[in-house]
């Protein structure tokens, strides 16, 4: 188990960036969010209700770690965290795509299973030309599915539990 914490939380606002935009639409910084099993983050515009037919359930929550952001900043300069389209930023440097199948547990009992790496969208090139290509191959974090409901707050302790290991809430 690897200890971490929630460095920042963001939700999608009224709309996401579109190809015709000249700058990425920033996400909204928040201090607390409700993770709902099988649905995602309740306050987010992309929250899925359990009855949404045909929705891919691996994409409920987007994650990135501070180390990944810092590596991109070393190449592209300062990056506003609310423009990289990740809902949860975790402290540390853990390269989340290497942890597919692992579970992130939070002090509140909320839990997310990492399901796949994220593919960067065109909006990354709006932050800095070439950033989208630099984020290929898992350099934009990972996607996760909510497996246990609970409140997640900025600064909250969390843990990454390897795939197959027993999952417990952080104490």
What is each residue range found by the language model?
Residues 1-101, 106-108, 116, 168-171:
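Electropositive, beta-rich accessory/interaction domains or terminal extensions
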Residues 54-57, 130-136, 160-165:
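Short secondary-structure transition/capping segments
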Residues 142-171:
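Well-ordered alpha/beta subsegment
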Residues 90-147:
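Glycine-rich active-site loops that engage anionic ligands at enzyme catalytic sites
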